[in-house]
A protein has these predicted regions:
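Bacterial N-terminal signal peptides that target proteins for export
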Residues: 2-13
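A cross-kingdom marker for long, charged
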Residues: 28-90, 97-146, 150-403
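Bacterial N-terminal signal peptides
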Residues: 11-22
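Sec/Tat signal peptide C-region and signal peptidase I cleavage site
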Residues: 23-27
């Protein structure tokens, strides 16, 4: 994999500082000092993480090589490429300067699941876009994502609107505070991609020829159920929640003894979100090889609820790759397995990592107890271990072949 030199690392940190300053100076009169301090902390944390050369998530045994060969899939990426070209054509010079980056730019790694009030983004937000630009942006997402993925994206944004209604903080919350950037030049043969980044919603989408990698991806939200307001009845991430519960409820006592890391869910357990590109994480729980055929199908169904956000047939290609490692796929659980339980689960194999976590409340303290995990706040993350988040393994192979 290519490493950043000291000059590149310094450039990243300076750029992050400029971004932090430029987005705070004009609005400091509106920012509470505590919020500004949080913003500085998140910006520094991202700069420090990005300053480390990318390795990828791996176990303590290190990176497994050769898992992600460049190959023909037979599935055209032309529709999403043309949609990206149409979106770029709507941007003026100033918008392009903050929304279009080189394919190997560290901007790929500059993302977070926290709100825009405490983590500044590059790119152009839906909030800033003209009507034509929004149409082009959504057309890009509709070509990249399945119908379910598009609806989940919209539903998470609607949840963000509910946070604004509950808290009245326009610096932090709003359904269009999501930023779009393009990486590389959309091409039939050369690598390119895009990133959508905002509160509880991050999509990194890499393309090389007809191969697609859509990780890291973060899907979350609070409140999970919108009871009142503009989008009353909006609900998110129930399939991911319920399928995980269905899988653990199928297990016998000897299996549960391996799966359950702790029966008590007392804190936030997610560990592989932002700034964790180089996380070392060993397998825990029950291996697929120790599950019966029905449980393996349930496990694949859980994984499919995440991978299915990717448009077919790219999703099916990804699922085929995951299925080849089903016996080496581990399932781990924290919490109870009763029907209304709060819990955390993790699915990990050489080619995928999924985390689901019921978290403590942040924006719904009006109705949820501080510090107590609730079904009303969900975080999920999907990663490609062993160096292929952001398609980095594919990119490295492509660049090596060019030389």
């Amino acid at each position: 994999m290519r490493k950043l030199n000291n000059s590149a690392t310094l450039t990243i940190m300076v750029a992050s500082l400029i971004l932090f300053v430029s987005t705070t100076v004009l609005s400091q009169a509106r920012y509470p000092s505590g919020l500004l301090n949080q913003k500085g902390n998140f910006t520094s944390g991202a700069a420090n993480a990005i300053g480390q050369p990318f390795r990828g998530l791996a176990t303590s045994d290190g990176i497994i090589e050769g898992l992600f060969p460049i190959k023909e899939t037979g599935v055209s990426s032309r529709p999403v490429r043309e949609a990206a070209e149409r979106f770029l054509a709507t941007l003026n010079t100033a918008e392009l300067s903050r929304s279009h980056f080189a394919i190997n730019d560290p901007e790929w790694r500059h993302w977070s699941n926290v709100d825009v009030g405490i983590f500044p983004r590059w790119g152009i937000s839906l909030e800033e876009m003209s009507g034509d630009q929004k149409v082009a942006a959504w057309a890009l997402l509709e070509e990249a994502l399945s119908a379910e993925g598009v609806e989940q994206t919209r539903s998470i944004m609607r949840t963000e609107q509910r946070l604004f209604e509950l808290n009245g903080d326009s610096i932090r919350y709003g359904e269009e505070k999501y930023y779009l950037t393009i990486m590389g030049i959309p091409s039939e043969a050369d690598p390119w991609g895009f990133q959508l980044d905002g509160h509880h919603l991050v999509i990194n989408y890499f393309v090389l020829g007809d191969q697609v990698v859509m990780t890291p991806a973060f899907w979350g939200g609070e409140p999970v159920v919108t009871e009142y307001g503009r989008y009353a009845g909006n609900i998110i991430l129930q399939e991911e929640q319920n399928l995980g519960l269905e899988l653990i409820q199928s297990m016998n006592n000897s299996q549960l003894a391996k799966v359950v890391l702790s029966p008590d869910k007392v804190r936030n357990n997610q560990i592989a979100a932002a700034n964790q590109d180089n996380l070392t994480l060993d397998y825990q729980g029950l291996a697929g090889s120790e599950m019966d055929s029905s449980q393996k199908l349930k496990l694949l169904k859980v994984i499919r609820s995440y991978v299915g956000a990717l448009r077919e047939p790219h999703a099916e290609i990804t699922m085929d790759e995951i299925g080849q490692h089903i016996d080496d796929t581990y399932f781990a659980w924290v919490g109870s397995d009763v029907d209304d339980a709060v819990f955390y689960y993790r699915i990990q194999s050489p080619v995928i990592l999924v985390e689901f976590d019921h978290q403590g409340p942040v924006g719904t303290l009006q109705k949820n107890a501080p510090g107590v995990p609730t079904r009303d706040h969900i975080h999920t993350v999907v990663r490609t271990p062993n160096g292929n988040d952001y398609g980095r393994d594919l990119l490295a192979q492509h660049l090596a072949a060019e030389h």
